[in-house]
A protein has these predicted regions:
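Acidic/histidine-rich alpha-helical segments that form the ligand environment
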Residues: 78-118, 126-142
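Short, contiguous alpha-helical
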Residues: 6-21, 25-76, 119-165
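Basic/polar N-terminal segments that are highly enriched at the extreme N-terminus
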Residues: 1-3
Length: 165
């Protein structure tokens, strides 16, 4: 399982890096433009992916590691509201999160261990591996939304191919 999760985490890092290269070419107004998606804009969707990675993987799941990683900077940024950061700061946080997620996969001793994960109104009892797969795939889903927005804006993009790693 570790090999699969490491591959997926490295893929997310690769895809995020390539997505950021495209997003850095856009005007800030294009990043913030309301395009009618659930999280309103490219930047809103980008922030949502980062929030989930920090809160769930680097927050809750990290607490299940034998030696939890130091994610204080990311947790502090999340607590103060990622939307309050400029784009350059968000890029730094994204890159830091991607590195730590790979380190977290390496630090987990037992991916089959079942843990409860609760949110207001719902809770799950799943293996740590399933939580990892769910959140890593969550990023893929929302990067696909960003790619579709870029397509509609006629901005060339191709940051999602795992075989290109």
């Amino acid at each position: 399982m570790r090999e699969v999760l490491t591959l997926q985490a490295r893929y997310n890092q690769f895809a995020n890096d390539n997505m950021l290269k495209v997003l850095e070419t856009l005007n800030p107004s294009d990043l913030q433009k309301d395009v009618g998606v659930y999280y309103t804009s490219i930047i809103g969707t980008f922030i949502h992916i980062l929030e989930a990675d920090i809160a769930i993987l680097l927050g809750i799941i990290n607490s299940y590691a034998p030696n939890p990683l130091d994610t204080k900077d990311l947790q502090d940024a999340l607590a103060s509201g990622l939307q309050n950061n400029n784009f350059e700061s968000l890029i730094t946080l994204r890159k830091q999160a991607d590195r730590l997620i790979i380190d977290l996969v390496d630090s987990i001793a037992d991916f089959s261990a079942v843990r409860e994960l609760s949110f207001p109104g719902i809770s799950f009892k799943k293996s740590i591996a399933q939580y990892f797969l769910s959140i890593l795939n969550h990023g893929t889903h929302h990067r696909g939304q960003i790619a579709a927005i870029l397509d509609i804006m006629n901005v060339p993009n191709d940051f999602a191919g795992m075989l290109g790693m």
